[in-house]
């Protein structure tokens, strides 16, 4: 089964996320486990944790279909010691929050070198950050998201992802989430079935399809290789409808979270319905 969903709100408490996902006909969802614009958050209450688990169970969401995302403030490759320590502490806390909620994954953007250190040094720092958090937790997989390659962000080449994975000690607890907009923006074409398959084959060659834990489904507002991260609604951007029809029929997309982050949350229910209709074309 294809597990399409969206990145839903946790307003009023994390326990509302599965309810919000259910309302839009989702079969998977993403969420933040706290306010992602702040460094510090109050610990999750026992009541919230229990309500979250109960709501997930009642709505039929299994842990492997839920892909929480860490705060955008975190930079696990930060060249400055103070920012790096702050990021590592925050990331470990988020891994622990995911663990407390009974979840098995945490999605994160790799990090940025800020033009202060080399790419290789930054990738090694990111991997060491992941190792520290994995050692401080149990059962939660760190899921690296590919990036569009804006600024000094790393993770826009498959080789970056492969290098981080190579340096992570526990390979059973590291994975990848591929964002279609980020792929396209960083130069990986998806527009035709042939282009889509070639990109997936390249990912398999460099990283390995066995590491694929989820997808973010977004069309792109900018052209191929623009290195600009601007999401568009499905079928309304430069990637186009055909890519998403092929994705919804692709066997590699079975039973992993396929998460919409398109600009208009009001249309997510319609986009989910549309994506499911693509399976039948």
Curated annotation (Swiss-Prot):
GO terms for molecular function: deoxyribonuclease IV (phage-T4-induced) activity; DNA binding; DNA-(apurinic or apyrimidinic site) endonuclease activity; phosphoric diester hydrolase activity; zinc ion binding. NCBIfam families: nfo, PRK01060.1-4. It comes from the Bacteria. It comes from Chlorobaculum parvum (strain DSM 263 / NCIMB 8327) (Chlorobium vibrioforme subsp. thiosulfatophilum). Belongs to the AP endonuclease 2 family. Zn(2+) 3 binds at residues 182, 229, 231. It is an enzyme of class 3 (hydrolase). Its EC number is 3.1.21.2. SUPFAM superfamilies: Xylose isomerase-like. Coiled coil: none annotated. One of its GO terms (biological process) is base-excision repair. SMART domains: AP2Ec. Binds 3 Zn(2+) ions. Keywords: DNA damage, DNA repair, Endonuclease, Hydrolase, Metal-binding, Nuclease, Zinc. Gene3D superfamilies: Divalent-metal-dependent TIM barrel enzymes (3.20.20.150). Its cofactor is Zn(2+). It catalyses: Endonucleolytic cleavage to 5'-phosphooligonucleotide end-products. Endonuclease IV plays a role in DNA repair. It cleaves phosphodiester bonds at apurinic or apyrimidinic (AP) sites, generating a 3'-hydroxyl group and a 5'-terminal sugar phosphate. InterPro entries: AP_endonuc_2, AP_endonuc_F2_Zn_BS, Xyl_isomerase-like_sf, Xyl_isomerase-like_TIM-brl. HAMAP family: Nfo. Zn(2+) 1 binds at residues 69, 109, 145. CDD domains: AP2Ec (cd00019). The lineage of its organism: Bacteria, Pseudomonadati, Chlorobiota, Chlorobiia, Chlorobiales. The keyword Transcription regulation does not apply. Zn(2+) 2 binds at residues 145, 179, 216, 261. This is Probable endonuclease 4.
